[in-house]
């Protein structure tokens, strides 16, 4: 290489050193100073990994003093290049010796990197292009936010999330029956709002006991890292900010924390985008005296744009309480309870018409009259004729029914603010079978109970009942905590025999206390060597994950998982169908929560519920109340909370004192009240609301599209290649899973989201659903998103040189492949990506400037190419420079035409969609007051903003591949 003092070179292996200057040439060695870092490097002149930096006419270069020069020509003197051109500040004709170039120059533009000899590997160019294609596919999908969560593809859940999640600042009541997945629906909406940029700051308010459950659900299912705030956390946060809520974007806290005026004031001042309130049916309200809890949520809902309330079914706690929750969502709309009741009465005609349309028979005259009256502003006679006619194609008739149903949904009821699914309207649940196993009370327990009775005269009824339900706890109080009650308790003997006779079955065992769960594991292990694992609140999230994974393993896994009451919250084990209740909780909601660990959509088998109990004890009496009074073992009991509230005192009396007459009276009264409530709920079912809530065929279509995406082998291949390029170690673990670990040769110093000790992942949804310790990889997963950002946000793959071995073409034939991106910088919240997603534009030029991209697709072209080393590639680029420069200008012309067309189409699509949606909402607002003015205002502003962003869109060259034909 011809070196001269003062020449500027760049290191091929350490480009971060910046522009170097030759400071010594002696014998066979050359020394280069890199002023940006102050470092010297000595190289062999013959094999120096250096590339000469020479700019060309038309380039802009910067001097060490900071001014720029537009190069018009260059000359050389004593091996030093002198640039001639116009001074950027004075406009004068000046010269600039290369020695005086700014040494901080970085070659960020692909063409600068190409001419500077910074040529990347061929496979990295391919991965970069695939990454840009994946980003385009994700951003342009109308299902953005629904694919990534580790949840089953349940139609009604996906429908609600799809409908609500894409709204601006949704204000909605989620009121599905227990077991239908309100938490998942809320999580899907949160995930969608975050991914689409509609929300950035989210506050979730939950009961104290559910904070950990929500934290786990958000992390494990939705890859969302929330922070739990309590008083201690708020005090700690003062070091970072006066308002602790500003220290995190995603926060979970209890209502108890916000009862304090100081904390509530801080929360009100924290600029949240979305408020989520779980167990909202516990917010008590009357017009004269709303509770403090209600006032807290009301104050927050007045300043936070989006609100999701998760609640029991509306009829579960009465209409006034239902109205109170709707009032939180829209106080202008739901301002008066009596007016609300009158309006609800008018819905009956709508429900009758909806029920008739939902069927498959001809419409009765009463339904036709109702429809004509309800949809008076629209001529519905053509649709009615189609539905009533004989010999019409079934699909045509169904389309007519669906159209009229949609008109009803749009115009009447609380369909936009309330979603309620019931088990009656959602199919796919297993049957539940109850099996009870009576056992005699051991002498040891009887003695402990007698002693306790003599000593505990001042205990409350509730304390006495709890004591009677857990005799093993009472026994330990009098012996000591290490007393081995499990050695004589007949329920333990039964459990061991049950597990031995069901060796091939997975069995979930739930007990009230963590200590009981630990003792049971010890008993199974020491007495029979049965493989079991425990799951309780004293364990960390990771420990629970490992226990759950051990239980889920088909081969070599635990036969039984023993959970405590609190420890099992939020965890589901649909792969098991046998549930052993070692004891009973006092609250019907907790009993349903236990059964709900198995009784969920996605459970493939009927559920067998097993209860070993001690005869003639509180355990038997509570079992009778649940089974005979509420039928709570074999059916869900939506009225359980109300019934417990009404009969709690009588029930506690019966549990604390054995009185058969009192028990009989309690059972009779409970049965009677249960039937009343059940009948009232059946009468209150709103067919139109149910149709709107489960989505019907539209929901199924969404699920089918998501399932097709799950099976996308192209995505799997692209992600695997992405990890290969970055340097992530991948170990096949079997069972559809891979272990990812950082390697010693990572391309980037850090890979956010990839732990040092690795993570187990799968591309298979069923595998991820059965294993809490395995992450589900989709294109929405943070590990994929981060990988895409690492590649596309760096210079990786921006330049490449390849050889095309094809004897049909003359040797030396040159092709230039250019990848452009339409750059329309806009905040994610603008939703610009819906109309103009980041789209790679490929141009393939021959040496004459003809674009061949339409004739030669990327994949077939790429397969024919071979890599060349960096040194040879640099020489080929240098030799081809006279041809390349005019080709870049030509390529930009072609790409600009494409971008202009894309922008025009995006503008047309945006105007058409938003205008149609605005017109629809404006016309509906006249007949349905549930259309909020804020939504209309948002659409008007959005159109103006998007037009501004589209006007400012620019073309950006993202990557270059130079290809030369060779016959060697």
Swiss-Prot record:
Q: Which family does it belong to?
A: Belongs to the SNF2/RAD54 helicase family. RapA subfamily.
According to the entry, every stretch annotated as the Helicase C-terminal domain falls at 491-655
Annotated function: Transcription regulator that activates transcription by stimulating RNA polymerase (RNAP) recycling in case of stress conditions such as supercoiled DNA or high salt concentrations. Probably acts by releasing the RNAP, when it is trapped or immobilized on tightly supercoiled DNA. Does not activate transcription on linear DNA. Probably not involved in DNA repair.
Q: Which organism is it from?
A: Shewanella baltica (strain OS155 / ATCC BAA-1091)
Protein's recorded name: RNA polymerase-associated protein RapA
Q: What class of enzyme is it?
A: hydrolase
What is any Pfam family matched here?
Answer: Tudor_RapA
Entry annotated with the keyword Lipoprotein: no
Record lineage:
Bacteria, Pseudomonadati, Pseudomonadota, Gammaproteobacteria, Alteromonadales
Subunit record text = Interacts with the RNAP. Has a higher affinity for the core RNAP than for the holoenzyme. Its ATPase activity is stimulated by binding to RNAP.
What is one Gene Ontology biological process annotated in the Swiss-Prot or TrEMBL record? regulation of DNA-templated transcription
Q: Does the keyword Nucleus apply?
A: no
């Amino acid at each position: 290489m011809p070196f001269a003092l003062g020449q500027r070179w760049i290191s091929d292996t350490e480009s971060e050193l910046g522009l170097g200057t030759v400071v010594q040439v002696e014998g066979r060695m050359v020394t280069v100073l890199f002023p940006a870092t102050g470092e010297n490097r000595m190289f062999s002149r013959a094999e120096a990994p250096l590339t000469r930096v020479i700019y060309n006419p038309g380039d802009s270069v910067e001097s060490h003093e900071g001014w720029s020069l537009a190069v018009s020509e260059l000359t050389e003197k004593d091996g030093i290049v002198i640039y001639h051109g116009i001074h950027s500040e004075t406009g004068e004709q000046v010269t600039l010796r290369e020695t005086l170039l700014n040494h901080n120059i970085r070659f960020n533009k692909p063409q600068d990197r190409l001419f500077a000899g910074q040529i990347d590997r061929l496979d990295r160019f391919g991965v970069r292009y695939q990454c840009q294609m994946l980003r385009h596919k994700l951003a342009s999908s109308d299902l953005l936010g629904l694919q990534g969560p580790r949840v089953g593809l349940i139609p009604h859940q996906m429908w609600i999330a799809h409908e609500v999640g894409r709204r601006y600042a949704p204000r909605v009541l989620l009121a599905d029956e227990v077991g239908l997945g309100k938490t998942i629906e809320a999580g899907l909406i949160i995930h969608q709002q975050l991914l689409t940029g509609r929300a950035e700051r989210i506050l979730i308010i939950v009961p104290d006991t559910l904070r950990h459950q929500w934290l786990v659900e958000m992390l494990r299912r939705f890859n969302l890292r929330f922070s739990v705030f309590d008083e201690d956390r708020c005090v700690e946060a003062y070091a970072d900010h006066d308002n602790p809520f500003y220290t995190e974007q995603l926060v979970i806290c209890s209502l108890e924390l916000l009862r304090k005026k100081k904390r509530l004031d801080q929360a009100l001042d924290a600029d949240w985008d979305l408020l989520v309130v779980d167990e909202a049916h516990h917010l008590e309200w009357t017009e004269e005296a709303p509770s403090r809890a209600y006032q807290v949520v009301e104050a927050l809902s007045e300043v936070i744009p989006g609100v999701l309330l998760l609640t029991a079914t509306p009829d579960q706690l009465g209409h006034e309480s239902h109205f109170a929750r709707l009032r939180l969502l829209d106080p202008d709309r739901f301002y008066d309870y009596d007016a609300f009741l009158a309006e609800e009465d008018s819905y009956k005609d709508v429900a009758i018409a909806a029920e008739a349309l939902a069927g498959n028979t001809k419409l009765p005259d009463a339904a036709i009259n109702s429809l004509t009256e309800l949809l008076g502003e629209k001529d519905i006679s053509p649709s009615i004729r189609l539905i009533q006619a004989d010999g019409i194609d079934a699909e045509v008739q169904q389309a007519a029914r669906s159209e009229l149903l949609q008109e009803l949904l749009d115009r009447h009821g609380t369909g936009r603010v309330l979603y309620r699914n019931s088990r009656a309207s959602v199919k796919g649940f297993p049957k539940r079978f109850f099996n009870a196993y009576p056992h005699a009370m051991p002498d040891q327990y009887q003695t402990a109970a007698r002693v306790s009775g003599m000593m505990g005269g001042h205990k409350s009824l509730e304390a006495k009942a709890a004591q009677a339900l857990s005799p093993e706890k009472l026994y330990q109080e009098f012996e000591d905590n290490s007393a081995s009650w499990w050695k004589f308790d007949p329920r333990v003997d039964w459990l061991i025999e049950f597990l031995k006779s069901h060796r091939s079955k997975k069995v979930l065992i739930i007990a009230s206390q963590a200590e009981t769960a630990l003792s049971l594991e010890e008993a199974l292990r020491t007495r029979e060597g049965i493989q079991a694992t425990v799951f309780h609140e004293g364990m960390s999230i990771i420990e629970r994950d490992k226990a759950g994974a051990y239980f889920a393993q088909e081969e070599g896994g635990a036969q039984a998982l023993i959970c405590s009451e609190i420890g099992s919250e939020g965890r589901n084990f649909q792969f098991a169908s046998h549930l052993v209740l070692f004891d009973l909780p006092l609250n019907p909601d907790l009993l349903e929560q236990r059964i709900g660990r198995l009784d969920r959509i996605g459970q493939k088998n009927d559920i067998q519920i097993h209860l070993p109990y001690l005869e003639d004890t509180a355990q038997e009496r509570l079992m009778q109340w649940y089974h005979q009074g509420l039928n709570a073992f074999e059916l869900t009991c939506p009225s359980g909370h109300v019934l417990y509230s009404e009969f709690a005192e009588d029930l506690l009396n019966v549990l604390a004192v054995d009185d058969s007459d009192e028990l009989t009276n309690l059972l009779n009264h409970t049965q009677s009240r249960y039937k009343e409530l059940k009948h009232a709920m059946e009468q209150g079912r709103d067919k139109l609301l149910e149709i709107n809530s489960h989505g019907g065929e539209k929901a199924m279509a969404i699920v089918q599209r998501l399932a097709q995406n799950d099976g996308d082998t192209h995505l799997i291949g692209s992600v695997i290649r992405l990890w290969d390029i970055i340097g992530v170690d991948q170990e096949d673990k079997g069972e559809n899973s891979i272990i990812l670990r950082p390697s010693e040769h990572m391309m980037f110093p850090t890979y956010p989201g990839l732990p040092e000790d690795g993570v187990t992942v799968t591309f298979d949804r069923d595998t991820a659903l059965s294993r809490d310790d395995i992450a589900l990889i989709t294109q929405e997963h943070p590990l994929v998103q981060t990988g895409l950002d690492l590649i596309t946000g760096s210079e990786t793959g921006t330049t490449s040189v390849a050889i095309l071995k094809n004897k049909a073409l003359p040797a030396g034939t040159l092709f230039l492949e250019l990848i452009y991106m339409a750059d329309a910088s806009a905040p994610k919240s603008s939703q610009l990506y819906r109309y103009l997603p980041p789209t790679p534009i490929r141009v393939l030029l021959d040496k004459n400037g003809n674009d061949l991209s339409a004739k030669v697709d990327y994949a077939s072209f790429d397969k024919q190419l071979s890599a060349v080393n960096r040194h040879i590639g640099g020489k080929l680029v240098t030799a081809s420079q006279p041809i390349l420069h005019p080709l870049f200008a030509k390529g930009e012309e072609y790409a600009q035409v494409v971008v202009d067309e894309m922008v025009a189409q995006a503008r047309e699509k945006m105007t058409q969609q938003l205008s149609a949606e605005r017109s629809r909402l404006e016309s509906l607002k006249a007949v349905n007051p549930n259309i909020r003015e804020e939504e209309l205002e948002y659409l008007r502003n959005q159109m103006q903003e998007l037009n501004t962003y589209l006007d400012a869109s620019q073309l950006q060259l993202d990557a270059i591949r130079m290809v030369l034909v060779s016959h060697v």
